[in-house]
Amino acid sequence: MEKGAVYTGIYPNIFELAGYEKKEIENRLDQIFQTLFYGSDEERIYHPVGCDLGYIEDTGNLDARTEGMSYGMMMCVQMNKKEEFDRIWKWARTYMYMAEGENAGYFAWSCGTDGTRNADGPAPDGEEFFAMALFFASHRWGDGEGIFAYSEEAKKLLHTCIHKGENGEPGRAMWDSKNYLIRFITEVDFSDPSYHLPHFYELFAQWSFEEDRSFWKKAAKASRDYLKKACHPVTGLCAEYAEYDGTPYTKGQNIWGRHDWYYSDAYRTIANIALDYVWFGADEWEVEEGKRFLEFFCETAGEEHQDGIFAIDGTVIPGKALHPVAMTAVHAQAGLLVQNEHALACVRKFWNTPLRTGNRRYYDNCLYFFAFLALSGNYRIY
């Protein structure tokens, strides 16, 4: 029997399983959205601009990134907030979209909050979230005109992502045409395990331009296979950046800094695996991965290292995580994969953890929102 919400329409509410009341859960989700979008200046990450624009701020770096802008759009479409969605999308299309040059059709990954570009290159995790949010917007609200013809914008963006550089055109594709794996950035030939969203690619395979659909179907399989290589067989941990064979990327530390460890970007990987399982139920390996991951944090790592830095084999590396609330959130989200004692303990810990405040709140609270959305059965396919 086929599993997954795409077949059954069922999105499990793990908070209810942990003993929380449905009304309490829904109220908390609304409160989280209101805090992130309309809270005090010390709480919010969303800023409306004028009558029809808005942006999501990376409060630690004081900029607007395609990561955050696309996350904000996904938050809005999931919560049925069309005005805020359109404001963020128009800001991105106005200031981030590149209409010419070798990256034409992509979005500059970082801009100042005044719209000034900080970079001329894209980051593929932004593009894939933009596309998915746009498809969902089309299906929830219908297509409008111009940049608000959501589905057409998504299709064109995805086409650029996989065909850029063909037929002598300048630039490079975001996905490698030989192995169907997403690149960390277009200029390099290694990946970031947390960029791999097979549950998105399955839907792209249904909704993209017809000539692109077989590519996305292959990309979904390639990403599921890749995650098995990138995640450690004992701990379940993965690195921030990894080679195409899944091994941690150790080169270029003078350029990128160190990223061969379980650290900031890598937290998203287990959350993505969990959502893939909820939506598609395509691979029982994902359940085993969830068990390994939870066992590592709940037994092996111990309470004193819940916010630690680790090599992917579980070796403790000196220092503390920059985003401890994000770690708490994704530990809980692993509870979508397996509902054992470890999982429920992590879910309850997350429930009792407030949103982060201070200048590092942006990344933590984005992962917090998505974890709460998923655990409450509200991170849905539209």
Question: Residue ranges of each PLM-predicted region?
Answer:
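Short glycine/serine- and small hydrophobic-enriched flexible loop segments
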Residues: M73-N80, F129-R140, H199-Q206, A271-V278, ...
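Solenoid-like repeat scaffolds
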Residues: K349-N359
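Extended ligand-binding clefts on enzyme/binding-domain cores
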Residues: E2-Q31, T35-Y38, E43-R44, L62-T66, ...
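Aromatic-rich carbohydrate-recognition surfaces in CAZymes
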Residues: L62-M69, R117-G142
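Outer membrane beta-barrel
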Residues: E83, R87-W91, Y95-M96, A123-L134, ...
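Solenoid-repeat scaffolds in large eukaryotic assemblies
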Residues: G72, E84-F85, I147, A154, ...
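Internal amphipathic alpha-helical repeat/solenoid segments
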Residues: R28-Y71, C76-A119
